[in-house]
Amino acid sequence: MRIGLITSSPDHPVLAATAALLTARGHRVEALDPTAGPDGQAGQAGPDGQAGQAGPDGQTGPFDPPADVYLLKAHTPAALALARRLEERGVPVVNPVAATELCQDRLAMAELARRAGLPFAPTRAAADPAELLAAVEAGGLLLPIVVKSRHSRRHDLVARVDDPARLRALAEEWPDEPVVAQPYLPSTGWDQKLWVVAGQLFCARRRSELAGPEHAELPDGEGGFGPAELSAERAAVALRAGEVFGLDVYGVDLLDGPGEPVVVDVNAFPGIRGQAGAPEALAALALRVGGAESGVPRPRADGTGPGVGSGAATPAPADAGPRTAAG
């Protein structure tokens, strides 16, 4: 089977480990770099350094022929456009483009989550930080709040705002940035990071980037957080998020603490660093979606291949309950 990685960083730990597992089993893994030019041509080499198959014009690309399944790790506009073209050809992409895009719009994410009954933090949108400042000065918005870029991306805005002066500074620094605001809720200074790969849960406690002066004595590094500390309620919230957003590989950020779970973010295909068992789960998912695990090859997008006429691949049996791994 051929598995494609849509990413400009195939050496990312979870991707590299997944690729190693797949190649050890005789599968071919190809990195497709959406930043490398038209159709990611320069990124078609696999971990073994060999180039992808050439098309009629002698160049490599995602459609000559496409791989059996693609893992969509990059979330840039170029990556999403590339993945969408693959989907239009009938090639499965994990996660689907529509689900990935939904998680990049923090307002749309919050609205869908709350409609579905997920305990998502209340979220309001504004054209820019200056609009939030005007709402605070008019008494229509209470501080403290967390201000985030509406559209999630690398190096976007995420800031805790305790007073109007901080909000005024953000308005000057990010004058044209569409934003969302959430109430800043008391916490331990840690975030509970839950990651899910095809229904298998992984978890860790990480220091919150919004930890304030009251958490000055919080030790650096990761906080211990294992399966015994993950309540059934919080595990259920994480699994439900995948159903709501149509995701197979995703992360759910929860506020740490003994109270009711509060979701502050959902991420499509996050890093999942340092989680034993995550590469194995991701490799199994790729094979299942691509059709190899069932023993029934997936028909190619052009309608050819040994799987034509044999029906869909047999789905994996449903789990009796969530599987959990420690961070």
Predicted segments, located by residue:
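Active-site nucleotide/adenylate-binding loops and adjacent lid/helix of ATP-dependent enzymes
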Residues: 3-7, 39, 43, 52-61, ...
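A long amphipathic alpha-helix within ATP-dependent nucleotide-binding catalytic cores
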Residues: 214-261, 267, 277-295
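Conserved N-proximal alpha/beta basic substrate-recognition cap immediately N-terminal to
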Residues: 7-43, 48-123
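A short beta-strand motif that forms the metal-chelation/ATP-contact edge
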Residues: 67-71, 194-196, 254, 260-274
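Phosphate-binding site of ATP-dependent enzymes
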Residues: 156-245
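Intrinsically disordered, low-complexity terminal tails and inter-domain linkers enriched
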Residues: 36-63, 292-326
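Short glycine-rich anion-binding loops that position phosphate/pyrophosphate groups of nucleotides
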Residues: 75-77, 151-152, 269
